[in-house]
A protein has these predicted regions:
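A short alpha-helical cap/connector motif
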Residues: 1-157
Length: 157
């Protein structure tokens, strides 16, 4: 079974609005790896059922992906209510962490048992187009915190 053709295009593509092509590229990339157990790490988590075009629905899609192909998926969010919402929507295969993302990523980067990352999806700080510096700075801190788990070929989104 092909995730992009059999699941993503049928269940998610038309819900995601302008984000759909980016997500399609992410899953096409994962499938091109031909890897049995890819590792996906996300910051920022699903917050609502309704906002497919804007809010954190990647958590649900990444969960579907690892349920089909196997692998590891971790999502980090600082807000307990977001974690609780996501727990009600994803399978037990997803690892959800309630923490400041930079602190959690730093811990993961030092965990010898945690695999190298295939897709790093940084979405924990919403971008303000009128003032992009705070979001950019936060995501750079996240990237530096997880850097030891980045490998040649890691897709960073």
């Amino acid at each position: 079974m092909n995730f992009v053709i059999d699941i993503f295009n049928k269940s998610y593509y038309f819900k995601l609005g302008k984000r759909r092509d980016t997500f399609q590229k992410i899953f096409e990339y994962l499938e091109s790896l031909d890897k049995k157990n890819p590792t996906i790490l996300e910051t920022g988590i699903a917050r609502t059922n309704e906002n497919w075009e804007g809010d954190g629905m990647s958590t649900l899609i990444f969960d579907d992906y690892i349920n089909l192909v196997g692998g590891n998926f971790t999502s980090i969010d600082i807000e307990p209510s977001n974690i609780n919402f996501a727990k009600s929507k994803v399978s037990s295969k997803s690892n959800l962490i309630c923490s400041d993302s930079v602190i959690a990523l730093h811990k993961i980067s030092r965990d010898k048992a945690y695999p190298m990352i295939d897709v790093l999806y940084l979405d924990s700080f919403d971008l303000d187009w009128n003032n992009p510096i705070p979001s950019s700075f936060h995501h750079m801190k996240e990237l530096l915190a997880i850097y030891p788990k980045i490998q040649k070929g890691t897709l960073i989104v």
